[in-house]
Amino acid sequence: MVRTTYRQCVRCVMDTSDPDISFDDAGRCNHCCAYEERTSKLTYRGPESQRELDRIIARIKRAGRNSEYDCVLGVSGGVDSCYAAYAAKSLGLRPLAVHMDNGWDSDTAVRNIKNVAARLGIDYQSYVLDWGEFKDLQLSFLKASVPEIETPTDIAIPATLHRVAAENGVKFIISGGNYVTEGILPKAWHYDAKDVRYLNAIQRRFGTRKLSSFPTFGYWSEAYFKLIKGIRYVYLLNYVAYSKAEAVKCLENELGWKNYGGKHHESRITAFVQSYVLPVKFGIDYRRATLSTQICAGQVSREDALEQLLRSPFDSAAIDGDKEYVAKKFEITRGELETILASPARSYRDYPNAQRFLGILYRTYRCVFTPRRAVTS
């Protein structure tokens, strides 16, 4: 059924830009209700979380006692991943910091990564993608006119981290992902990045190159690394009293970290996609999800969030320069970029995908394996 009336949650700021949103009799949406019922149990809970964290750290140290590193840590130059590095080092872990370089990093992000690694005294490895392949693949998603423009990055990151972990005999990957800043994100806004059939279908239709070196991470790869190699993710920030504002202060004062703008704007393409392409073309404003999470976590008031949403998601004075930069990186003309952006919006459903199979697979997995808060996927 097509929704014909606009509605916004009375507690958070999620609205009918999520086609799957629902509301209870009090006007609260399914997202903030789910946060209360589920996510609040998966965030910091005082001494209980501390005890669980102590057990996790002991397990990581024990598993890596005979290796140079006891964990791999993905870093992007953003707040969450840099603070996760700070937390890991403070807890006595020996991480190998790994950055997946897709060619779109801002200068600020690169400096942040190097400063954090140097000041914490941890080894840092940059995994550089083949730019020609990656550029062609990401341009294919842009031409496909779907919201999942960042799927190539989203799938390359876990692929890279798992490969590096396996190469170094490491069993744990530390992630900066957390429920305080990312507890709410509508599934309708971004289709499953692990659907390799979907990725390959997009590339076959719109791409010009064969993907010979691009690292994918589909369900079979995930099963291999998880069940055969025994590699697990650990979300440290869910076990500490994590405040993004306090984390920023800490990083700035102790590690020379510099702010780069909005959430995930450490990447030039992510900034362009999330602040301009998604809101303008698809009516998707990621700020709503971020602010709604922060409201539910008690870190932002709804009034402040609504005030922020009154501002444009992109800088009108800078957008022309951003478009020129993106077109140049993709090696297309500004006119070609404008034509692509103006093409009708489409959905993953318009292309071959494995949604039905993945649904069965994930349901089976949940039945067989008991979900654990500390170590997932």
Predicted regions and their residues:
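Nucleotide-activated chemistry modules centered on ATP-dependent adenylation/adenylyltransferase
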Residues: 1-71, 87-377
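Short flanking/linker segments adjacent to small metal-binding domains or redox-active Cys/His motifs
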Residues: 79-82, 334
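Short, glycine-rich nucleotide/cofactor-binding loops
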Residues: 71-80
